[in-house]
Amino acid sequence: MGINNINKIPVRNNKISFVAVHLIKALTSKKQEKLVKLQRKKKIISVIKTWSRSSTIVPLMIGEIIAVHNGREHIPVYITEEMVGFKLGEFATTRIWRGHLKKTTHKKNNKTYGLYF
């Protein structure tokens, strides 16, 4: 390789990424191959449910739909190439933003109270 080709070399991270064992089994099992054949015939979408938000997205997961638990429900996440290296939990938010409090003044003593809506 010459100096001109240095920019084309992919940079690899030496850290070991965690992936839950049940996710690897679900992605590589023979059942998955059978489901792929059924998907082509009947247009069935297979979703893999997981509670493992700390699992890293690996290239094996590209094109799959993984339902990530956010504490209340499973959020379906379609895995793309740009997501590789991130954690599954980053794509299923756990908190709901309800905005800032609305402040009102009462006529009796002119104090300001925060009201929750």
Curated annotation (Swiss-Prot):
GO cellular component annotations of the record: mitochondrial small ribosomal subunit; plastid
BP terms from Gene Ontology: ribosomal small subunit assembly; translation
A Pfam short name: Ribosomal_S19
GO molecular function: rRNA binding; structural constituent of ribosome
Coiled-coil positions: none
Job of this protein: Protein S19 forms a complex with S13 that binds strongly to the 16S ribosomal RNA.
Protein name: Small ribosomal subunit protein uS19c
Gene name of the encoded protein: rps19
